Amino acid sequence: MKKYLAIIIFLIAAVGCSKDVLAEQPVGDINLKPAPGSVEMTDLNESVFSILNLDYPGLGEVKSFCEAGDYANASVSLLDYWRTRAVYNPEVDILSPSVSAGELNIADQATEEGEWRFKVAVYTEEGESGSGTEKFWSFKAEDGSINWSTVPSGLENEKEFLSQKHRLQWMVPQAKAYAVTKEFKYINAWYTAWISYNTAFPAPTGQTDAVEWSGLQPACRLNDLMNVLPYYIHSESFTPQALANVLVSVYNHVESIRANPFGIGDSNIILTQQQAIVTAGILFPELTKAGEWFSEGSAAVAKQLNDQFNEDGVHNEFDISYHLGAVADFISIYKTAQVNGRVAELPADYTECLRKAAGFIKNVIYPNYSTDNFNDTRSARMTKSVLLKNLRKYSEMFPDDAEMKWLATEGAYGTKPAATLVSYPVSGYYMMRNGWTQNSTMLIHKNNYDTANKWHNQSDNGTVGLYVNGRRFLPDAGCYTYNDGSDRRTYASTEMHNVVTKARKSYEKREGRLLLAENTTGYEVLVTENPAYSDLTIRRAIFFVDNSYYVIVDEAYGDCADTPINLNFKLWGGKADNESGKGYTVIDGFSDNSLCVHSTFDDDNNIIIKSFSETTDNIGAENSTGYFSNEIDTKVQRCWTRLNVDKKSGKAVRFISVLLPFSGDFSSQSVEAEFTDNTPETAGTFHPEGVSLKVTVNGTPQTLSYRLNQ
């Protein structure tokens, strides 16, 4: 409350000094100071008065001028009103604005002086995206204007570039740059580009399939437009014409989104569209259809709250980045409604639904505030600063959650979480860890129940990601591209993951289910299963032994016969983010029924992965190099191994894999493992009720087992 009271005080003070503080050129053709008589004005979009509810409290003077036909002074009065109105956008910090070096780089390039170089997703002409020094592609035409049809060579078929260039992603960084520096070039560039864009792509009437007015494009533009207006509204460069054009743009964007809803009713796209509609209804109550927008949008948001998340709180597309985005959208809607006195009109269970969703992020991120590349996550975007920003929002939303506060403050306040085994059985995410600090060990197991085969989800049921003391040892493949084609299919294929496959084929089904999750003396155990193929089911049991190492037991059982079963491990990258892992990997080789590989980092943070097969029919091993992707159009080389065994009729193929973190010399490490629930004569027998085995690490034997309640 103190924050919003301070905002009110600031706004009142700003109104009193806004005409004297700056000496700028206007981004229109009118001196802002109101005159008692008629004001000459060119380029005024008088249609703004047809979309305003002139009976709205505070617009009396505007209405009087309109009734007298004096639209020039009506527009000046409207601007004065807008600068003092009691409507607040909590997404904007006007009291203490800040801009990062990276944002300033974006803002500077998106100007005439910067050759109209616009940020479009991760696409750059030079430099690495997100580095803060990258150079974006220029949209400058020969006459110095903006050429919105620009498509750089090589990006003609890049679907994400062709769509995201219509989201105008530089607007918010540019507004923040203006708020901090008060340099005229930023507001001038923003307004010039905005008018140019809307002239090139006027709002359609009714339905359209044009990319610039479909899907996320208009919703993202509108959400950002609503977030830049508070930064500019008190500038002497912001004219009545500018306000009129912005209000008409808001109206046209909302109406176009309403006329062109995205076809899939529970996707992240429809949520962003509804967020734009309901937010416009809150932030622009003076517009004639604001009531409709809020009513329609809030009802849709209530439905989306239930549709977007599964019962256990995980986003229905099973992707960490889209989960993060959906939670952020819902929190933004809630806070905007809250600060403007509309929160009572949202569903009563709104915050509790979000509490579960926020809890998933708390549990799925690695202890160094990073994520894996599961599905389309693109871990390069999930930086520590991004994750902390979202965790702080969660902590503010749920101040009673002491564990969230601990994470959000990097341990400065709150209570360190104690959970070591966490399950999300409806969706199929599981975490096994020995702590919550950077030097901890953590494994994520992914076995989704996804009968709809969501587009952002990959057929990787059973895969694992492994983090040890700041290093990802088994980074997920990632997606590499959003384009339909062989590259996307390659990275999404099952064999690109740490799983068991049949003849290297991708899974036919994603029907993961949890069979067991329990703590027992000396270890934790997690057992899941997926009927991956019509004739083969894959069961995976993961033991976390002595909070030290993992043992993975894979059993492939079913009717298929005389078919190779593959145990795939996709290994680590190098020490640097985009460095090959080949120079840090030793394939120790295949011997008898086992395959061993280990890492060779020079910081005493290494791992051994040794796999054993119970049966040896046509047994063999392969290894080579491949890639994983942390970001669109980037890939990192790594090694992989594959242990192959033929499955015989009436038998199962069973593997034991030991994942042993170690420091010191590799030569001093020893790992052995064997099943103890079969004899040599009964090898390959599947026991549906459970499994028993013995693992010996560095001379210390450990008996492991689980039993299911049949």
Where are these regions (language model features)?
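Catalytic Cys-His active-site segments of thiol-dependent hydrolases/isopeptidases
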Residues: L474-G478
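Bacterial Sec-dependent N-terminal signal peptides
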Residues: V15-A35
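Extended, charge-enriched "interface" segments that sit outside catalytic cores
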Residues: N53-V151, E158-Q164
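Carbohydrate-active enzyme catalytic cores, enriched for enzymes
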Residues: V314-F473, T520, K648-R654, V671-Q710
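Aromatic-lined, polymer-binding surfaces characteristic
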Residues: D143-A358, V364-I365, A541
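Sec-dependent N-terminal signal peptides
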Residues: Y4-A13
